[in-house]
Amino acid sequence: MDWSPSTPSEPGCLPAGCQPLGRNRSANVLEQHLRPWRRSDQRWDLLLLLAATRTAEHPGISAAGATPESRRFTALADAELLLEGPDGPRRWPLPPLPAGVSPALLSHVALDCLPLEPHLAVLGLEHPAPFSHLNLEPQDWGPAACLSTGRAMPPERVAWLWRQGLDLGARFQRPVLLTECVPGGTTTAQAVLTALGISVGNLISGSARQPPQELKRMLVEQGLRRASLPPQPSPLAVLAAVGDPFQAVAAGFLVASRQPVLLGGGSQMAAVLALALAALEPRARQDLSRRALLGTTAWLADEQLGPERQPALGWLLDRVGQHFDVPLCGVASGVRFHDSSSQLLRDYERGYVKEGVGAGALLLLAQLQGQPPQALVEACERAVERLPSSP
């Protein structure tokens, strides 16, 4: 894609349309978190973790694929779209969605104008990845069990994945944009946060237009009842009971990292932040809170859940921070599709899809590097037109 030259956004202010999340929104705090991502002379790393959990096989639990069968290859299809673009070679078809288009399309558009080096890791997927990736575990380990069993992963697997995350966190030296593709992952996020003693109530979103909160709550209650965790369980015990492979690697990564980390997503990133904070001493928690920034989409940032009718993600970020006595910071991209020429993109404004594959963080980073929101919208529209069988 041929992008015009851009100038990084001015220090001390957010790019057009961007909004802070939660209470930790003073100008000085925001600038401290955004400064590493404004630099025009900086290269960054993108770490995308693709993972699977049998939790995604419950009908209605996720819209990241319209059927349980299609959700088994969502992560591979989204990764191919991110890397190759809408008209590139593809081994796996994009799964059918109730509405909208894969967020990996938005991620591809933003990635195309950024000096990011992508690294992908595959965890528990049932099919081999047709692209270069990090091998962090044997493929035959397969997906995590449904969290409702209370035995999502063997403790030995959790310990192995945690160590892999520690190794990656220590190995990466440049700022890292960390993101994921895990169908069913918002439900494991809810389970992990609940197991850590954080009251998340109606604060967990999902890919569906109307998140199946009652189904999520039922699965989480079943899993925690069967797990019989002790009071104040360790992060690894929580993961073994109700977690997924992505969370184990990502939390280990955060524990060992010393560089700025931009967390691309919503409640799943809040969960891995909570796991990492639970594993750290108070001083190290403060250090992580100064380096970690959550980046998301405007659609997820604006979503109101539960009777409070308040933006849920900001409340969730605050609640995690309060639990561990650290301030946590988040920013939403300013890209909106109200006036888009594409119905698939306008569906985002109707509450479909919302986020995934780091779309919000990548769009935010593109804006911080000087790309205007309208230019990104138009690039997304052109990308939609290049999709096979695009309406």
Residue ranges and their predicted role:
Residues 2-179, 183-391:
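N-terminal loops that bind phosphate or other acidic moieties
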